[in-house]
Amino acid sequence: MLSIVGSSGAGKTTVCKAVMGLLSSNYSISGEVLYRGENLLHCSKKRLQAIYGKEICYIMQNPMTAFNPSLRIGRQLEKTCYLHNPQISRQELQLLVSNTLQQLGLDDLKRILKSYPDALSGGMLQRIMIAAALINQPTILVADEATTAIDACNRIELMQLLRQLCSGGMAILFVTHDLRAASMADRILIMNDGQLVEAGTTEQIFNEPKEEYTKYLLSACTLERR
């Protein structure tokens, strides 16, 4: 797991969108986005459609932008899965949707699946959005502030789930403004004002920070704990 940490406006979400190919043509992107030897910046639209949503999935910062307000949650999750698994049976599809939601601690399945997005809380929508990203069992998960709208108890459970997914072979890019949440990552990148200012293992960042901005973020964590 790789975590990108920085305050609001540091450029974290822009990095996520660049990785996912979601930046508008107003942006100029240099470098490479490599996935299994392919530079995604140079792939065809057809190839990208096969990769994004199936092999590389994105958890957006705002759950309300991820759902169609006119479709029930159950239908949206089924369409997300069926798009990349058209051979799946109806029974398998329903079971996969139910199991994925329960994995995120969502047990009131009947109500959730029949609900429209605006009938659910922000925290519940956040977890459903995470379920939508996990339903196709991606190899890479890009999570932009995935724990922000979730209460403390469910946040801990989600972070534990992310670690379990990593142990199972999934790679995760975990974006957060909170260094404490980033402590579960293997490596951390610190961003400030659109620039990468420090990178290292989690132990190095927490125990041997080199940059003043990193030290500032660490001191902010200490103050919050008090």
Task: Show which residues each predicted segment covers.
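Conserved ABC transporter NBD signature motif
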Residues: S28-N39
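C-terminal boundary and immediately downstream tail of ABC-type ATPase nucleotide-binding domains
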Residues: I56-Y58, D107, N207-R226
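A short, proline-enriched helix->beta-strand linker immediately N-terminal to the Walker B motif
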Residues: I135-T139
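ABC ATPase "signature
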Residues: A199-G200, E208
